[in-house]
Amino acid sequence: MYRANRKARVRECIEIHHDAVAAEKARLKAKGKAFTNLEIGFTKRRVLRDKKNPKVINLPLEFATILKGCEEFIDNPSRFPALDIWVSEMRNRQARELVAKVLACLLSNTDMISGRVGKPTEAGMKTLSYYQLQEDYALRFGEYIAPKSFGKAIKYLKQAGYFHSEAINIRMEDGEGAVRSAPAYKQFSERFFSDLKVVRYSNVAESIVATRKRQMKEGLRHTWVSFREIANGVRQIFLNANKFESIAESTGRVFEAYLPLHPNPH
């Protein structure tokens, strides 16, 4: 039943995707505007998960270049050298397309300065589960992806040294020592951003910094949400966040070397 419910949520996201695209076409037609390509996929567009009012919105400008880089990998294996060198499956175009699409979903939910995958909130960066990211895949591409296929793409990214994750285990206060888990910390590496090459383009770097400043003005924080917040008051949490804080600092230095940043107090 649990798996069936998850699959049903993904199917709903696929429907929302198609409804949102249809609504956007109707909106443009009513304004007399031409539309030649309303794909979401590797563009800076995003579909909001709103069944009652399906809608297409725009992500910040930097995502146009970043997600285009993901699409380029499909026909150009050397676009991401570490994947090309260390993951033999990348010789297959279908495998590259899988990785490119999963990358697009991860990156559209990533703070581009720290490399943290999640959602910035006033309490901090909220972790996202792989199931949530699979639903985002359905919203972005309008198609179903099997959890096993999504997991393969993640494995390839880790094998290339591009992506890291750390489980969050929570000991419950049930007297039996039961352990539950929360969505893992997920993090892109400095190597990934070096291969992505976003800092080579001043307009992209400037847009990334502008996005961070705008979010900070809105009161959003980009450090991981506190352990207590994740555990929601349970007694003990077993995790290793220090490693990911150092990775985030290292990733941030890539941007600092290119475009001076003021330290983020959040």
Label each residue range with its predicted role.
Residues I113-E173:
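Winged helix-turn-helix DNA-binding recognition segment
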Residues M1-Q132, A241-P265:
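Short recognition helix of helix-turn-helix/winged-helix DNA-binding domains
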